Amino acid sequence: GVLEIVGLFSDSRVIGVCDVDYDTGTPSPQILYYDYSCLEMMLISSDSAFTPFFHTYYRGKAGFAEIRLKLLQELKWLSCYRKLNSICGWGICFNGLSMKKAFEAETQNINTAKIISQIRELNPSFTEHIRRQVDQVHKECIKNDGLPELLSITQGHDFLDYFREICSTTWS
């Protein structure tokens, strides 16, 4: 990754910029990390950066802060699962997970049962492990309540995919 690339250079002026994701290692003085988990979440956290983006695509009645918080809260379960997967080394594959398949247009919510079903489909050899992990994820969700915590654990791509689904219902 970025740390290895920076390590190839003997010049201390060479820096790398990368996502924090769920990295808990010792930071390098030559690595700059984005606030929160990734560049997308850093921009989403900033009212001045998110507001113009929000107003370009969203046509509903709610304000940007209300929608941002709703999305973060709805994604909390998935975000906690991703976090625990990274920290505990569970090896769960999330590639191919679809917000569209988990999105319920009537309520504009994410159906967690549909997320779990997709995770099982993407990881057929981990079925029993997933059942146990789901309980741990529920416990982890209790700890991550405030806006800063939600911004720190949420993946930007999940947020943007969910935002796209919400916007698609407000354009109708």
Regions from the PLM with identified roles:
Residues 1-172:
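Acidic, divalent-metal-binding catalytic cores of TOPRIM
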